[in-house]
């Protein structure tokens, strides 16, 4: 691999809830993803789309998270702490949260002008 163990975790949080302190939530979820993937927070990218038009069974708040990384994903171990984080920080119940995990091939992810593989 070109960049050693840098795996560039990415998380995209879409929610129908309105988030007051977006920067704080982005920093905290970056720290969480860094911890769960065992990667430096320096390489975690986080995106937040709040107050989105979303519907999941009814009009109560819901959340959809996309998590991508070159390796370092363990969905069965990561799902619960991520759902708990969303519940604690935003108040969305676990049964109103979907998470999509994607292990991206190193040849399909680039940073700093070059792919990782």
Predicted regions and their residues:
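Short, Lys/Arg-enriched N-terminal segments with co-localized hydrophobic residues
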Residues: 1-7
């Amino acid at each position: 691999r070109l960049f050693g163990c840098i795996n560039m975790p990415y998380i995209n949080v879409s929610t129908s809830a309105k988030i007051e302190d977006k920067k704080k939530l982005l920093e905290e979820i970056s720290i969480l993803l860094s911890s769960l993937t065992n990667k430096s927070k320096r390489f975690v990218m986080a995106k937040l789309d709040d107050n989105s038009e979303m519907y999941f069974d009814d009009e109560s708040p819901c959340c959809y998270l996309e998590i991508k990384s070159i390796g370092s994903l363990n969905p069965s171990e990561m799902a619960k702490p991520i759902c708990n984080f969303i519940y604690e920080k935003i108040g969305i119940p676990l049964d109103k949260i979907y998470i999509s995990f994607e292990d991206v091939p190193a040849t399909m992810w680039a940073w700093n002008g070059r792919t990782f593989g």
